[in-house]
Amino acid sequence: MASRTVAKDIITLRGSAAIASEFFGYAANSILYNRGVYPEESFVKVKKYGLPMLLTQDEGVKSFVANLTAQLSEWLEAGKLQRIVLVIMSKATNEVLERWNFSIETDSEVVVKGVSREKSDKEIMREIQAIMRQIASSITYLPCLDEPCVFDVLAYTDKDVAVPFTWIESDPKLIANPQMVKLHSFDTKIHKVDTLVSYKNDEWDEQ
């Protein structure tokens, strides 16, 4: 009698945390490249998510992103991370020009009981692809950043989380009267990530 083996795509808490934290690393690189925060020649092209992606070769930024993704993975696995915000600011004035907001919903049953979920890697990759394509085309819906900029990353965690000394308390770095663009989301069935970018509305200032 013929038998058939059916493979299931099992997503564990640790696996989901790895997917989401890796996504944040690639998304941060893509934002810094596409928004011109760092020069084009300081990035190299790699293939990820079935797409050409850009990674910084700036040692300071590489180290920052590596430490960031490691910490995010730890918080995601503990179910303690609520939101990550990449903030782009004017280098001269520190005025906040853009906020790339990634809000995270965590399946608490998985964290508490250690159960797993099912979703195919291909489906998750397709959802991430859609977000990465939107970041890559951000020049079509965001105003040009025509001044030198710097960036920072804010993490919103549960109050009881242990925070490393390398992280400091911060104000939310909000934008007054921002314009907002909602991007796609992805869901590992354990961590759901919604993406929203808000930016300074110069037209409002001129009225």
What kind of region is each of these model predictions?
Residues M1-Q57, K62, Q71-Q207:
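Long protein-protein interaction modules used by eukaryotic assembly/scaffold proteins
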